[in-house]
Amino acid sequence: SGKHCIIGFFFVFMQAIYDTGIGYIEDESIVRIDKIQNRRNPQSVIDIANKLRDDKIIQEPSEDLNAPNMQLGSIIQGNVKFVYADNIDNLKNLKAKDIFTDWNFNDGEHTKELWLTHKFNSTKAGFSQLFELYNSDLIFEMIQKIKKKISNGDISPDNKNFEEISEEAAITKGKGILILDIIKGNSKYNNFYETFKSSPWQVIENNYIDSDSLLSYKFNGLKGFYEAGTKRDKILRKLDDVFELFELYKYKKYNAFLRKTKFKISNYADKKRLSDEMNILSNNIDKTIEEVIISANQALRIENDVFFDEFINTQGNYLWERIKKIPFKEYMKSIEYQREYLPFATQHSVKGSEYDNVLVILDNGKWNQYDFRTLFGSGSVNEGVINRSKKLFYVCCTRAMKNLVVFMPTDDPGIIESAIKMFGNENIVNGNDIS
């Protein structure tokens, strides 16, 4: 047609924290337009970020006097600290000290504590049992591995119950330890195993737990509210419905509340009875998930839908037997975590976000895809691990709008010396010496 078309590619090389996608385009025909001015971070964080960058860009404060990182015509200096201690357990004590005087760890909107994985955060946020069930349940792991052995033709499932096929399959974990032995040696797991061991294998094999289901409660930007994602299972959707009723009543949205229940209000006595019922329900969060569902159904005149009943009696049977005994408050904590009401988040999840105060914990646990020691010239020599760790650390640091504290459990003199070069000697804190 003779018309010229300009195609723009927007990306930040240092924020390519996932192995999928394209992190960098190398083509001589592309005109590179670098974003030099930084509108988010204080000077102290910009300085750290520039030391981490390996894309040949050196950022500087914005020239816009109205930029978020400007105050009275000058760049906000901000504060950065590198804190080290012998043990990760020291962190709890450190959070109560002067270094965090102006931080409010109950304010998830302005303060974030960044850990590498949801597993770390589930413990901190108060839903570790739920997270373990959806991500590392031993009985479900054994079921999946037995199915794989059957698929490979290693064993035959014909006319066998769960106990028989579990013993024949001899599934191992770690250093050759039988998963079945681990299950029998754990009273919690063994109780569930005893419940299901006589069931026919063709019934057991249909049980499924989707690890993505628990954390699939997301904000819908178009609708302006949080809702269940497509991977949300029927049990969690039921809990979402109950929790929604709690919130509708709490925030006095009575018309919407009544539309979703069969509770009828004809006089003051009905209104008083509803108030009493809701007070009882709201004080029952320490009860189990099953107890809360039963109480809510009875008090609010609601019923389980056919999809819920079908799910808990078929592929969700084992999941239901497990989850129904977990305290309802763990479910509530998982919702608060996903709504970002709590100060905990994964380092991957905050890309694009910004907070006044950011605490980054450099502990990669047992995830061998990362090694934060490489930031300071130690640890893994794997190039992928080195690049992955650096970019993730860069993303974490550049979330801070005022204060950045990096905590690392280490006593390695080489790491501490390298940290001094990166952060400056005046910004290094020995957490072991803080009393």
Identify what each model region corresponds to.
Residues 1-435:
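The feature marks helicase ATPase cores and/or their adjacent C-terminal helical subdomains
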